[in-house]
Regions:
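Conserved ABC transporter NBD signature motif
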Residues: 67-81
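ABC ATPase NBD coupling module
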Residues: 79-106, 132, 255-259, 292-296
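Short catalytic/signature loops enriched in Gly
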Residues: 81, 155-158, 251-303
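A short, proline-enriched helix->beta-strand linker immediately N-terminal to the Walker B motif
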Residues: 183-187
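A short, surface-exposed alpha-helical micro-motif characterized by mixed small hydrophobic
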Residues: 231-233
């Protein structure tokens, strides 16, 4: 029996940044897969490389960043920039990614106020991508935008389309970001810290919305977060990142109830437990994250 290919396969992905201090190897040969209809959580503290991995996938690295090795097989096609060497080839790569970004792969960013243009109406920001990828009329794009706003729970969408980002609350702006991400029925949705800037009540609402989307869609989803509570409630599998490496990968139950790697165990032990004796202090992970300028080939947690 032939196994179906995963929607996304990352194999040996390496990304580095040129800095004044030297070369920072931000990703050191990471591997993971995402299947259709699956939710993968990528968890790690700040600087672990989790967002760099997604920017590498989307072709959105800063000018000093480069994917130096690895394959990124999306829907059966390698979209890694590694094989594009000449100026002409790099233009071909950018043309390919422009067709994929926002269409087949979409991204939900963590700070909606920074992502949304403050001087452009919500209607224009929502319909721009729809018209670019679907080649539809202005009226058809507007109807799709209204439909999407209803889907993500924004009341009176017809009138609110004419408003600007500052006229919406933080939670509503995040819903708009999610609506934009869903506009072209993507095969893969990447959510980068989708609840970080929101209060607890709004976080729960956004998580419920993401859960509903994953249940009703066949799209694969990647959730990037440092919040283990988010992945526990939403994800099928979890990859734990540290120092540019994936330290451990498993189902949500395996990671939470049977962790293998010392870093994963330390991460779980450092979480406040509502059932624990509150007189006992939290157990922080000792030491500091490794300096990626100096880290060799050893396990970053062992360093």
């Amino acid at each position: 029996m032939v196994m179906d290919m995963s929607l996304l396969e990352i194999r040996g992905l390496e990304t580095e940044f040129q800095t004044e201090q030297g070369v920072v190897k931000a990703l050191r040969g990471i591997d993971y897969t995402v299947d259709k209809g699956e939710v993968l959580g990528i968890v790690g503290e700040s600087g672990s490389g989790k967002s760099v991995g997604m920017l590498s996938l989307m072709g959105l690295l800063a000018p000093n960043g480069t994917v130096t090795a690895g394959e990124m097989i999306f829907d059966g096609e390698d979209i890694s920039p590694v094989k594009y060497k000449t100026k002409k080839e790099k233009k071909e790569y950018e043309k390919k990614m422009n067709a994929i970004r926002g269409n087949d792969i979409s991204m939900i960013f963590q700070d909606p106020m920074s992502y949304l243009n403050p001087i452009v109406t919500i209607e224009k920001q929502m319909t721009e991508g729809i018209r670019a990828h679907d080649k539809c009329s202005k009226q058809e794009a507007r109807e799709r935008a209204v439909e999407l706003m209803k889907m993500v729970g924004i009341p009176a969408p017809e009138s609110r389309l004419k408003q600007y980002p500052f006229e919406f609350s933080g939670g509503m702006r995040q819903r708009i970001i999610i609506a934009i991400a869903l506009a072209c029925n993507p095969k893969l949705i990447v959510a980068d810290e989708p609840t970080t800037a929101l209060d607890v009540t709004v976080q729960a609402q956004i998580l419920d919305l993401l859960r509903k989307i994953t249940e009703e869609s066949d799209a694969g989803v990647i959730i990037i977060t440092h919040d283990l509570g988010v992945v526990a409630s939403l994800c099928d599998r979890i990859s734990i990142m540290y120092g540019g490496n994936i330290m451990e990968e498993g189902t949500t139950d395996e990671i939470f109830y049977d962790p293998k790697h010392p870093y994963t165990k330390g991460l779980l032990n450092s979480i406040a437990n509502s059932n624990a004796d509150h007189r006992e202090p939290l157990k922080p992970i000792p030491g500091t994250p490794p300096d990626l300028l100096k880290l060799g080939d050893q396990c970053p947690f062992a360093s």
